[in-house]
């Protein structure tokens, strides 16, 4: 689904599959910049009351928390670290991966980006977009650039579509990319037998489930002006590894600034591992999977 992020579990799917929707996305290069606007739930009086006092340290600018948080935090200034899960850059800045980074998306996810002035090539419409970001409206835009190009994003000069359609298009492309990555193995034919076509390998259960999700996304419509996010949150996108098996850890999408719940599954069947917790964090699935394997082995020996 995604370019390689590092580690066998990350090449295809991040725990927050709606990464580009939850943090926004931009082109990484002069003249290319596309951003995703998405609608956050309104900040209720109860949520605002739970925020407590504003930061004690003097801030050049206050911004909302990452994601759809309602509380105020100090904006990151030029040269400071930035990323998906840490405070936003100030209004005139963008969060970029460091030049030459081999894993730019991973850098943004892990907070290893840097707040910089907007790079050359932004159009007047894009400047207007950045001004709207700090208004009191219901739209929130996180400026974290460097991911859209890797997912085949829009090119410079293309008229941006409506925000809801843009969200859905990015999401579809993200799942399509996972689909293509998992099918790469079947496309590399032997150089010695260029005319001999090999039958495609059988789809694994995880790949089949992904196919079904992709089909549902392709038929989604926008019935109103609320945008597609509420519909996307109801989907579970399977986290498949490069071999098409389920990754041990599966996670729901992040919502309202909170990490989604994660649980452990059998890599072959995708069924939950008994005894493993469901938590907002790392359930350390390898421990429960190893224990299950040992129990299954002991049971097999008793049967023999």
Swiss-Prot record:
* Gene Ontology BP terms: cellular response to hormone stimulus; female pregnancy; osteoblast differentiation; positive regulation of activated T cell proliferation; positive regulation of growth; regulation of insulin-like growth factor receptor signaling pathway; response to estradiol; response to estrogen
Q: Where is the IGFBP N-terminal domain?
A: 36-118
In its keyword annotation, does this UniProt entry include Lipoprotein?
Answer: no
Give the matching SUPFAM superfamilies: Growth factor receptor domain, Thyroglobulin type-1 domain
| Matches recorded under InterPro entries | Growth_fac_rcpt_cys_sf, IGFBP-2, IGFBP-like, IGFBP_1-6_chordata, Insulin_GF-bd_Cys-rich_CS, Thyroglobulin_1, Thyroglobulin_1_sf
PROSITE patterns for the chain: IGFBP_N_1, IGFBP_N_2, THYROGLOBULIN_1_1, THYROGLOBULIN_1_2
Q: What's a Gene Ontology MF term here? A: insulin-like growth factor binding
| GO CC list | apical plasma membrane; extracellular region; extracellular space
**Keywords linked to the UniProt accession:** Developmental protein, Disulfide bond, Glycoprotein, Growth factor binding, Growth regulation, Secreted, Signal
Q: For this UniProt entry, what is the primary localization, expressed as one broad class? A: secreted
- How is the polypeptide modified once translated? Cleaved by MMP9 leading to release of free IGF2 from IGFBP2-IGF2 complex, which contributes to enhance the motility and the growth of astrocytes.
Renumbered to this chain, the signal peptide range is 1-34
Q: Assembly state and interactors?
A: Interacts with IGF1. Interacts with IGF2. Interacts (via RGD motif) with integrin alpha5/ITGA5; this interaction induces cell migration, adhesion or apoptosis according to the context. Interacts with PTPRB; this interaction leads to PTPRB dimerization and inactivation.
**What does the UniProt entry state concerning the protein's domains?**
The C-terminus is required for IGF-binding and growth inhibition.
Its recorded name reads Insulin-like growth factor-binding protein 2
Origin species: Rattus norvegicus
């Amino acid at each position: 689904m995604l370019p390689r992020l590092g580690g066998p579990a990350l090449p295809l799917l991040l725990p927050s599959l709606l990464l580009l929707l939850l943090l926004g996305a931009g082109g990484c290069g002069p003249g290319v910049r596309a951003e995703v606007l998405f609608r956050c739930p309104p900040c209720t009086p109860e949520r605002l009351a739970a925020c407590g006092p504003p930061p004690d340290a003097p801030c050049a600018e206050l911004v909302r928390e990452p994601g759809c948080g309602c509380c105020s935090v100090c904006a990151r200034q030029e040269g400071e670290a930035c990323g998906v899960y840490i405070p936003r850059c100030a209004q005139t800045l963008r969060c970029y991966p460091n030049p030459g980074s081999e894993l730019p998306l991973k850098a943004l996810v892990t907070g290893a980006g840097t707040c910089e002035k907007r790079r050359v090539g932004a159009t007047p419409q894009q400047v207007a977009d950045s001004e709207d970001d700090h208004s009191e409206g219901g739209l929130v835009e996180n400026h974290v650039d460097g991911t859209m190009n890797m997912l085949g994003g829009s090119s410079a000069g293309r008229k941006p579509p409506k925000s809801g359609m843009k969200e859905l298009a990015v999401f579809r492309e993200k799942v399509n990319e996972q689909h293509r990555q998992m099918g790469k193995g079947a496309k590399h034919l032997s150089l010695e037998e260029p005319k001999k076509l090999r039958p495609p390998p059988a789809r694994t259960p995880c790949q089949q489930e992904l196919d079904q999700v992709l089909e549902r996304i392709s038929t989604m419509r926008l019935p109103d002006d609320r945008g597609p996010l509420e519909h996307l949150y109801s989907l579970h996108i399977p986290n498949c590894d490069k071999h098409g098996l389920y990754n041990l850890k599966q996670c729901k999408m992040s919502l309202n600034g909170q990490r989604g719940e994660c649980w452990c599954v059998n890599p072959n069947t995708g069924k939950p591992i008994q005894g493993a917790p469901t938590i907002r964090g790392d359930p350390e699935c390898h421990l429960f999977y190893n224990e299950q394997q040992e129990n299954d082995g002991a049971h097999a020996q008793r049967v023999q």
